[in-house]
């Protein structure tokens, strides 16, 4: 049998990781190209009869992915939902492939630099977006994503990883990497604010709490700092100078149930619960919620509860898109009872990461795990 030089598929895999990482914030095509190189490297890896050892977390994820496909077949969406689930499952492949080709710290540092560069490019493109709008900063930032919410959530997650890296570079005096991480972190925060994504803001705050908690050895000092920041934050938000700040007003609007956006979100959540109850155990199927959401709004006279004509039209548009405005309610409606082990998967990963951080010495891996924990918490809180 033809023998493959291990160095060849390792280099192909590394190239795939680099392209994938650089493309995260800027190009879906780039992500797919990077994934293509990773798949090729993985096939060569198998050809070379290399053993694959999955971690407990990877086994859990793999089982869930298989069950997602099975549930999609038997869901109300049938073959259509199965096809959509199959198309979207490729997003999880890097979880299994990337660790195979991160062979040393040099590769990790290149990956992190490319991650930061991806944020730079995304931010610059976002500035060009505002230039087209004649610098109308009331508009929500869109860079390479098709929707500001997508932009907001990935920025919230990315900024938390960068924060952990910043602390690492300062603690270990890695001043060569400090400028790129610091600039990327600042730009990510600015862009995050400009997206006006309230859920992403909450996600960032939740992830920030976890990151700071894990990085501060003195937990009493952490509690004092949280209380102090909370008091100062409330004082700043309620001060006269910031009472008309559009970003603060947007954040405060989360609790306003009469706000049109919030009302639509609640109606979509109600419809998802209705879908779950009426389509047990398999759900309505992947990307198949729009028909049921529209039926729910019509049957329960939800359009009549909207005050303005444009609000009724907007509700119909959102319902028709099948966007249920929450990973939890979307999973509940589309995947049925599988939603519970699916969400449990993320909580299990968090638990394993937390245990790792408690027992681990504070090296680069520790800070990377803390950063990815922050990312996962931001994802789960932002929902």
Language model: regions and residue ranges:
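Transmembrane signal-anchor hairpin modules in multi-pass inner-membrane enzymes, especially those
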Residues: 1-83, 101-113, 165-179, 220-225, ...
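A membrane-periplasm/extracellular boundary helix in multi-pass inner-membrane enzymes
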Residues: 194, 215-262, 270-278, 286, ...
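Long extracytoplasmic/lumenal interhelical loops at the membrane interface
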Residues: 257-270, 282-335
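Aromatic-anchored transmembrane helix interface
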Residues: 58-66, 78-101, 110-114, 119, ...
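Selective detector of the "anchor" transmembrane alpha-helix that sits immediately C-terminal
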Residues: 334-357
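Alpha-helical transmembrane segments of multi-pass inner-membrane proteins
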Residues: 16-20, 107-137, 146-217, 226-242, ...
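Membrane helix-loop boundary segments at the extracytoplasmic
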Residues: 20-28, 326, 330-335, 366-383
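Membrane-embedded alpha-helical segments of multi-pass membrane proteins
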Residues: 28-48, 85-96, 150-159, 202-209, ...
């Amino acid at each position: 049998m033809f023998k493959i030089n291990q160095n060849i598929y390792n280099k192909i895999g590394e190239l795939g990781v680099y392209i994938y990482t650089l493309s995260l914030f800027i190009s879906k095509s780039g992500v797919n190209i990077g994934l293509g190189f990773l798949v090729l490297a993985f096939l060569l890896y198998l050809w070379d009869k290399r053993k694959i050892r999955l971690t407990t977390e990877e086994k859990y994820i793999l089982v869930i992915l298989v069950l997602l496909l099975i549930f999609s077949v038997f869901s109300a969406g049938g073959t259509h939902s199965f096809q959509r689930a199959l198309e979207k499952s490729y997003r999880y492949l890097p979880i299994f492939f990337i660790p195979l080709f991160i062979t040393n710290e040099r590769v990790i540092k290149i990956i992190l630099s490319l991650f930061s560069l991806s944020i730079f490019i995304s931010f610059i493109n976002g500035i060009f977006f505002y230039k087209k709008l004649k610098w109308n900063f009331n508009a929500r930032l869109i860079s390479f994503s098709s929707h500001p919410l997508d932009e907001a959530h990935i920025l919230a997650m990315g900024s938390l990883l960068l924060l952990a890296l910043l602390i690492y570079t300062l603690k270990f005096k890695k001043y060569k990497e400090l400028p790129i991480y610091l600039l990327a972190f600042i730009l990510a925060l600015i862009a995050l604010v400009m997206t006006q994504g309230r859920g992403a803001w909450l996600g960032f705050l939740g992830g920030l709490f976890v990151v700071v908690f894990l990085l501060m050895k003195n937990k009493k000092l952490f509690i004092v700092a949280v209380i102090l920041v909370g008091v100062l934050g409330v004082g700043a938000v309620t001060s006269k100078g910031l009472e008309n700040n559009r970003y603060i007003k947007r954040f405060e609007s989360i609790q306003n149930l009469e706000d049109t956006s919030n009302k639509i979100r609640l109606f979509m959540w109600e419809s998802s619960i209705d879908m779950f109850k009426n389509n047990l155990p398999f759900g309505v199927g992947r990307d198949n919620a729009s028909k049921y959401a529209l039926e729910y709004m019509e049957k329960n006279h939800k359009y009549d509860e909207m005050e303005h004509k444009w609000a009724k039209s907007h509700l119909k548009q959102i319902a028709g898109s099948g966007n249920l405005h929450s990973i939890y309610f979307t999973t509940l409606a589309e995947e049925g009872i599988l939603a519970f082990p699916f969400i449990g998967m993320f909580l299990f990963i968090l638990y394993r990461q937390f245990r790792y951080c408690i027992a681990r010495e504070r090296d680069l891996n520790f800070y990377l795990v803390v950063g990815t924990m922050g990312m996962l918490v931001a994802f789960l809180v932002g929902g």
